Amino acid sequence: MRLISYLTPDGPRAGVVEDDQVHPITTGVMNVVCGEEIVRTGECVPVAGLQILSPLRPGKLIGIGLNFRDHAAETGKPVPELPLLFAKMPTAVTGPSGPVRLPAYTDKADFEGELAVVIGREARDVSSADALEHVFGYAVMNDVSARDAQLREPQWVRAKGADTFAPWGPWITAADEVPTPQALGIRTW
């Protein structure tokens, strides 16, 4: 199952994507992530031509720095023993084709394609062995960074959390359709 949010003349709507069609549903994507049953409206609209929004607007967005061995190597840093966490503000979130607006404090923006992991069940102090049981699904995210601010400051909130610095989507793919997320490839262009 792939869940999408898109704009209609009546406002935002959510739907299930099958092939190149969207089947609108009666609730929002966040409600589905939280366990609400999907009820289709019976309509069907083509994906092509839709103004696609962020699949959902999370209240908390946590990133992991240096999360790929290759990326750590290219920066000359070792893979951290503990995850290097950073936050992106809710206002950083935008749709997959939304504009990225650079703040005045940066002259050097950069981007990295990332796998967004959507947590569907409340979790705290979860073991590695049980972590995937809490995952609702996956999406593609563009982790935009103000590299000059990132190199200048010890914390990364300003560098990575600026408005529009987290375009993602176009949809969330349910975890049961991704049996081995570690084997996924991510490509940007």
Question: Can you annotate each of these PLM segments?
Answer:
Residues M1-P83, Q155, D176-P179, R187:
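N-terminal non-catalytic cap/leader segment that marks the start of a structured domain
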Residues L61-I62, L66-W189:
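Glycine-enriched loop-and-adjacent helix/strand subsegments that border the catalytic/binding cleft
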